[in-house]
Amino acid sequence: MKTNEWISDVPVYEPGKPIEEVARELGFADVSEIIKVASNENELGPSPKALKAMAAAAPEMHRYPDGGCFYLKDKLSAKLGVKPQNLLFGNGSNELIEFLGHVYLGSGTNLVMSECAFVVYRLVAALFNAQVIAAPMKKFAHDLDAMLAAVTPETRMVIICNPNNPTGTIVSSAKIKSFLKKLPAHVLAVFDEAYFEFMPDDKKPDLIKEIQKGRENVIVLRTFSKAYGLAGLRIGYAVGHEKLIALLNRVRQPFNVNAMALAAAL
């Protein structure tokens, strides 16, 4: 059978072992003695309100979820000060990164990222047979000038994880504003803000304002996995220009966000 040849070169993500298995191998009787640091999970767990909402939703699990995330979209758009059309939800922000790959990446294209950043960016680029250009960092922080210098006519996206995973460094609002002024209009700036809620308020860049102003080549990705402790439910969201969100919605499968995740996030 004929297949897409490059798929054989896509690396397979290898998840860590379950804590229970690690405990068994190391001879620990109590799994609470082991702390799993690889996935940056919130050890406080979900909010009691989220647990209550999930319990209330459980009897309706025979129903398909709200495919348009209507109520969550309505509530979150009001909180962020954007229109519902500026929002898209995914099965974790990982799925949203894959949506971006569907829309922007392919053979002969590339994405620019820092040399030490979230592994999924490389996996998604490989999935669509796109090149990764890894820009050098300064003291484990994004060097936005180096990232700009790496942009070519074939570049479709520049991905900035802020705060960065795994180095934990933050790019200032001033540097981001300067970066956006210089970024070519044909390139999408993707800001992965999975750890946004952990930043001090005076360090948080307000990229939502760029979207409110109508800027088309900026998208912000956030998640309920980290600060809200809902990693096991897989729910994240994108904020972007409504034209961009409409394109991403075309590659989204129906019912991609499960009903339990919707209940907990709401």
PLM features per residue range, with description:
Residues 1-63:
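N-terminal "arm"/small-domain region of PLP-dependent enzymes with the aminotransferase-like
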Residues 62-110:
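Phosphate-binding glycine-rich loop
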Residues 32-33, 83-87, 107-110, 154, ...:
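Short acidic capping loops at alpha-helix termini that bridge into adjacent secondary structure
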Residues 36-38, 134-135, 157-163, 189-193:
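Short beta-strands and strand-loop turn motifs
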Residues 144-154, 166-189, 193-227:
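Active-site pre-lysine segment of PLP-dependent enzymes
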Residues 103-160:
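PLP-dependent aminotransferase-like
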Residues 68, 217-266:
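PLP-dependent aminotransferase class I/II
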